[in-house]
Amino acid sequence: MKGILNALYHQKDLNDEEVKRLFTFIINEEVSPTQLGAILCALKIKGESLSEISAAATTLLEHAPKPFKSGLDLIDNCGTGGDGLKTINISTIAALIASSMGLPMAKHGSRSVSSHSGSADLLENLGVNIEMNRAQLENCLKESHFGFLFAPLYHQSFKKSAPLRKELFTKTIFNCLGPLINPLRPTIQLLGVYDESLCKTMVLALKALGVKRAMVVNGGGTDEIVLHAITHACELKNNEILEYDLSAKDFNLPPYDLKELQIESVQESVQACLDILENKGKDSHTMVVVANVASLLYLSNRAKDLKEGVSMTLEHLKTKAPYTHLQKIIRLSHA
């Protein structure tokens, strides 16, 4: 441990073996809170390398319980969080709608650290059992195309380090790791990052971990695809990386102001979610979610492009099927 800390203090990248040892220490609680704080801050100041992020994710996945093999090309749209902008739960609402359209969504997430409402906070307040056991998760995913994997259940290091990480008042390598360590190993991912500079690193990390199709995005400083600003995207397609910018025009949607997406409580996010699912949400809320669903449809080859994905989603919302689908998910999660 001393050697690893000294290397980090001198701003040297750790090799794969050092990262594996370090995260094994963290998993086995062989690191004191003081040491963990020093490690996270040193990594942050140095800048986490692609190889460090990939090796840490691989180590955490090796130690995580394996829920089951679904036999499906699962999709996740978990983001890093940490943008601090306190918006509605765009990705979680998008996952619920996408699953109601038949996309197999294995949503990996946790409670909020920097916002009013994380994915677990929203789903729990909607009535979903966020701590599904193996049988419940498998059945819910099979019957509703939606399953929620509460990160602390599968990665104890996340749960035990959460209070310390919150006290650091900064993003850490754990923000980057969250979207990479879904125990069900999805093959398709839409991943939002809190900083545009992470887009290339994270899409390469997904590729290294075996993901086949992905898009890593940062929209106007948020870890989402947005309509109020340019969204920078790095796409993994046919084993190649494509880098480009997206605007509202690419979705054939109008722009909206960021302020219209910001909330003050989890209750506001819950109401926004229910309104969107019933096709009576604010346009600013609905359209940004639609853009994210469209991207999931595009990545899964259900839509030939983003504009077609938008049209498909808007037509689906008119049926109000997503709201009925949520009730099914709630019931199955407790069955």
Curated annotation (Swiss-Prot):
Signal peptide: none annotated. Mg(2+) 1 binds at S91, E224. One of its GO terms (molecular function) is magnesium ion binding. Anthranilate 1 binds at G79. Anthranilate 2 binds at R165. Catalyzes the transfer of the phosphoribosyl group of 5-phosphorylribose-1-pyrophosphate (PRPP) to anthranilate to yield N-(5'-phosphoribosyl)-anthranilate (PRA). This is Anthranilate phosphoribosyltransferase. It comes from Helicobacter acinonychis (strain Sheeba). The gene is trpD.
